[in-house]
Each structure stands twice: as C-alpha cells, then as structure tokens.
From Swiss-Prot:
One of its GO terms (biological process) is negative regulation of T cell apoptotic process. Induction: By prolactin and androgen; inhibited by estrogen. Its main location: secreted. GO terms for cellular component: extracellular exosome; extracellular region; extracellular space; nucleus. The modification Pyrrolidone carboxylic acid is found at residue 29. It comes from Homo sapiens (Human). InterPro entries: Ig-like_fold, Ig_E-set, PIP. The keyword Disulfide bond applies. PANTHER family: PROLACTIN-INDUCIBLE PROTEIN, PROLACTIN-INDUCIBLE PROTEIN/SEMINAL VESICLE ANTIGEN. Keywords: Actin-binding, Disulfide bond, Glycoprotein, Pyrrolidone carboxylic acid, Secreted, Signal. This is Prolactin-inducible protein. Residues 1-28 form the signal peptide. The keyword Cell membrane does not apply.
Length: 146
C-alpha cells in the first residue's frame, strides 16, 4: 500500500512539467490562422466626376483553398464598373487583387465585401472549404469629393 501511495504522489518536478505542458498548449491554441486578410485601397479625396480606382487585395493563411466572391457596396448609386462582382479561388500561395473603376460627384461610403461561398467549377477539382464561424468579411472607407 505504501508503494502505491508513492507512485500516485505528485512530485514538484511532475507538477512543473504539467504546468509547462498546459502553458504550451494554450500558446498553440492562440496561433490560429486568419481566414481572410484584406487590404482595401481607394483615394481619400477626388474631384467631381474624376475616375476612381478601388483596389482590393485578398489573401488567406488557411492551408485549404476557398471560393470567394468580392464586390463593392456604396451609400449612393455609382457609375462605371462599380457593380462588377468577381469570383475566384483563393489559396494561401495565390493571393488575389481586384480592381474597380467608377465615377462619383458626391462623397460616398464604400464597403469592400468578401464572401466565402460554395460554388463548383472555380477551384481545381472543386476542392475548397467554407469556414463555419464567418463567411463574410468587409471593410468600409469614405471617399470625399471636393
């Protein structure tokens, strides 16, 4: 019986080892990959009826590919190629950049939206994932007309 008690008694070294393993596991859980990384670039201000180019660069840290649909939404209707929607296969080794050219004569809020969707025929062999938690990502900028 005494031998059994010695086997189950935790030594300080064992407790320290368990603590270090627990801290290491928590740190590993914090290292999650980002689903979508986006950089939306438009001028801060333009003159009335000048052509504006909006650029959206999108990438992922996931190892799997995703089908993404990108588009712009504005607070007022805009002219030009503003309403174009792009669909692409986004993989960690193949970031994408999308361009829109449009005109405006009023200050406007513009949202660049990235939806992760389920669509066949976009990614090779239709091998793509859809995140469970989030499937819509966006960023909003203000374009001032002066």
């Amino acid at each position: 019986m005494r031998l059994l008690q010695l086997l189950f008694r935790a030594s300080p070294a064992t407790l320290l080892l368990v603590l270090c393993l627990q801290l290491g596991a928590n740190k590993a859980q914090d290292n999650t990959r980002k689903i979508i990384i986006k950089n939306f670039d438009i001028p801060k201000s333009v003159r009335p009826n000048d052509e504006v180019t909006a650029v959206l660069a999108v990438q992922t840290e996931l190892k799997e590919c995703m089908v993404v649909k990108t588009y712009l939404i504005s607070s007022i209707p805009l002219q030009g190629a503003f309403n174009y929607k792009y669909t692409a296969c986004l993989c960690d080794d193949n970031p994408k950049t999308f361009y829109w050219d449009f005109y405006t004569n009023r200050t406007v809020q513009i949202a660049a939206v990235v939806d992760v969707i389920r669509e066949l025929g976009i990614c090779p062999d239709d091998a793509a994932v859809i995140p469970i938690k989030n499937n819509r990502f966006y960023t909003i900028e203000i374009l001032k007309v002066e």
